[in-house]
A protein has these predicted regions:
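Long, charged/polar, soluble alpha-helical segments
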Residues: 18-191
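Sec-dependent bacterial lipoprotein signal peptides
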Residues: 1-16
Length: 191
């Protein structure tokens, strides 16, 4: 009799611990936070945090299936927190990439203007047109890369914008140096 009373107390205690409602509200909040993180670019910029949030929400659902609502609540709250962290991380990363792309575009634009100015100086110095043809071609290609970078920037693809702008800046700077080398001997010959 005593043993059955102890078993009955344990069963009542376990049933009492498992009673209550599943944390539906918290799980919905976690799901909403995950969707917000995805919309904010977390799949691309904060993959680790987003994956952690999705896994925590899956664990919460599993715990609800096992009627362990306390554990489900804990996982749901963790999922929501991780999703919010993923959103913030994605926003920060995008802002950093945007700033880098803006700097790269500025450098490319400066290099383009410098190359154009060097070309004009070479023309004024009466450097032969056939010699300048390659420089004109390089400047046109650089303009195309700068335009590609601007297009990528406008589409929000800041990594591609930075890459295209950096390539353009490097190539245009080399063209400007090449033109300087052509102008210097021509200037010495006139003296």
């Amino acid at each position: 009799m005593r043993q059955s009373l102890v078993v009955l107390c344990i069963v009542v205690a376990v049933a009492g611990a498992c009673s209550g409602d599943p944390p539906d509200k918290e799980m919905q909040q976690a799901q909403s936070a995950i969707e917000t993180a995805r919309a904010g670019g977390a799949e691309r910029f904060a993959t680790t945090e987003l994956k952690g949030a999705e896994e925590a929400l899956a664990h919460a659902r599993d715990a609800v299936g096992q009627r362990d609502y306390r554990l489900a609540l804990s996982f749901a709250l963790d999922a929501r927190e991780r999703a919010q962290s993923a959103t913030k991380e994605a926003i920060d990363r995008k802002a950093t990439l945007r700033e880098e792309a803006e700097r790269s575009l500025g450098s490319a634009q400066t290099a383009l203007l410098a190359a154009r100015n060097r070309l004009k100086a070479a023309e004024v110095s009466k450097v032969q047109a056939r010699i300048l043809a390659e420089s004109r071609s390089n400047i046109a290609a650089g303009e195309g890369r700068v335009q590609e970078a601007r297009t990528a920037f406008e589409q929000g693809n800041f990594e591609a914008a930075s890459a295209a702008a950096s390539q353009a800046a490097t190539a245009l700077a080399q063209t400007a140096r090449d033109l300087d080398a052509l102008v210097a001997p021509a200037a010495r010959r006139r003296r």
